Structure formats: C-alpha cells, structure tokens
Amino acid sequence: MDLLEKKNIKKGGEVEEEVARKGEERKEEEVVVEEKSHQQQQQQGEEELVGLSLAGGRPKVFPMSSPPPNPSQLTIFYGGSVCVYDSVPPEKAQAIMLIAAAAAAAASATKSNAAIAVKPPVMPAANATQAAVSPVLTRSLSLQSTSVATGQPQVAADPSSICKLQADLPIARRHSLQRFLEKRRDRLVSKAPYPTKSSEGMEASGMEVTAEGKAQ
C-alpha cells in the first residue's frame, strides 16, 4: 500500500508539473502574440503618418492588393446581332470606328445622289399656262411631232414669230371676211338687173368692214 501511495503521489506531482509547464508555455505564447500585435499597430501608425505627410495632411488609403486588370473588350451591334471581342487595343478599336463612319457617310451620299437623279423635272406654271392658252404654240408643237414621226427635219419655233402670228390673226380674219362679202356682192350685182335693198345693205356692210380694216 505504501508503494502504491508513493507511486500515486509521484504521478500526481508529475501531472502538476506538466500542467504548470503548459500554463507557462501558454503565457509565453500570449505574450508573443501581444508583442506582435503591438508591433503591427505601431507599423500601421507609422504608415498612416507617412501617408498624411505625403498627402499634405489628408488621410490616404493604401490598398492591400490591387485587383487584376479586366481585359479590354469590343462590343459591336450590327444587323440585329451583338458581337463581343476580347483583348482589343484602343488603337484598333478607334480604327474600326473610323472605317465604319466613313462607310456610313459614303452610303448616305450615294442615296442622296440617287434621289436627285430620279427626281422628275418640274414645268414652270407660266410656261404651262402659256402652252394651254396659245393655240399657235399648240399647233407648232403638233407640227413638230408630225415632222418627227415622218422623219422630216424639225424647225425651231421663234417666240417673236409666234407673237406676230397671234397679233395678225384678227386682221387676217377680217380681210378674208371682206373678200367673201365683196365676191358675194359682185355675184348679186351681176345677177340682178337693178340694185336692190339687200345689195345696198351688203355694200354698206362691206364698206364698213373696209373702213375698219384701213383704220387698223
């Protein structure tokens, strides 16, 4: 019994020593951790002071780690579809934009030229009215179309001659009427043995027409 008690006492003492030793190790580890944290705090304070001095008294944030740069992408919308290209330098993207702008400008210029070429000629209102009112011009145009159909050489209409013909139309009509009345009067005179009232009236009307023609 004495031996067992001695062994137990010895084991108990060893256990107590082991516990005490582990407690001391833990204390030492805690002291080391505290010292490290204190050193880190001091280092951070020094860095903040240096940052303030460099920024002119303003606080400056130092990033711990910079994120990786995103690769440059080019997105193109064309024909209702979306195309995305990776790793496109800015110079190449600018060149593509210049080429697209030049192509768009050329397409718009082509459309405008085509619209101008297709536009029908507009006839002025004054010329249209003159063509509708003047029968002489209509007759000359019909003569020109007939000459084209038959293969004859065309003769250009002179505006001064057209105006002269328009002015001479009433005089020509009066002269033809005068000649007709004179012939009719001569026929009646030759047939009748003596002058009648109707012939006298016709002579008077013929004299009036002659007087009007001379006055003009």
From Swiss-Prot:
Expressed in roots, stems, leaves, spikelets and seeds. Belongs to the TIFY/JAZ family. Ubiquitinated. Increase in jasmonoyl isoleucine (JA-Ile) levels mediates its degradation via COI1B-mediated proteasome pathway. Induction: By abscisic acid (ABA), wounding, and drought and salt stresses. Induced by jasmonate (JA). Negatively regulated by the SCF(COI1) E3 ubiquitin ligase-proteasome pathway during JA signaling. Residues 67-102 form the Tify domain. This is Protein TIFY 3. Residues 1-38 have a biased composition (Basic and acidic residues). The jas domain (170-194) is required for interaction with COI1. Repressor of jasmonate responses negatively regulated by the proteasome in an SCF(COI1) E3 ubiquitin-protein ligase complex-dependent manner. Involved in jasmonate (JA) signaling pathway during spikelet development. Targets directly the transcription activator MYC2 and suppresses the activity of MYC2 in triggering the transcription of MADS1. Keywords: Jasmonic acid signaling pathway, Nucleus, Transcription, Transcription regulation, Ubl conjugation. Residues 1-47, 184-216 are annotated as: Disordered. PANTHER family: PROTEIN TIFY 3A-RELATED, PROTEIN TIFY 4A-RELATED-RELATED. It is found in: Nucleus. It comes from Oryza sativa subsp. japonica (Rice). A motif (Jas) lies at residues 170-194. The gene is TIFY3.
